[in-house]
Amino acid sequence: DGQINNNEVARIFVEWKKQANCVKGDDRKTLLNRNFIRMQERLAKLEELLKGIGGLKRFSEKYPQKAMLIIDKTLRFHQHRYNVVGKHLLYLDLDGFLHIYLRHVEELTIAGYYSERTKFQLDEKDVEITIKHVMKALNEEYQVFRDKYPDKQFRKYEDDAYYCNGDYYALRVEPDGRLIQFYKIGKG
């Protein structure tokens, strides 16, 4: 029937048609529906991560400014690719983004919830820039590692942590290239 079943693929396809001025008939309605489904899926992920403090509703009531920030970031998030050189992909998806931001970004600190985690001494907007810088700097090493160990996690911890601008950063990357952890471990 020519229908695309994967919501994200269908949404991107209709977005592309919109940019190419090829939108026809039900395409606008399809795009609205696909965007609504995407929004629901993303908010469900956020709800799951916040269930330890009573869920998204309670979080929003108790911390309205923080809720606005993380909801906006969640809904606007686009997957980041950190390398264009090399055959092995390095990227950050929504799950990795939420893991990093909810645990390690000071502006999103919630009393008693991941509060023991090391926080970036950066503005929220600068965290993304730092991650990008570190991942690009590690790309060559990552490519060599991935060729040698295709099924192992790439890790930088403790003595092997990456040094950048006076701080050391620990990270973990899944075999498929997905960044799943990134945090500051102390001053140099």
Question: Language-model segments: what does each one mean?
Answer:
Residues 1-188:
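Ribonuclease/tRNase effector modules and their secretory precursors
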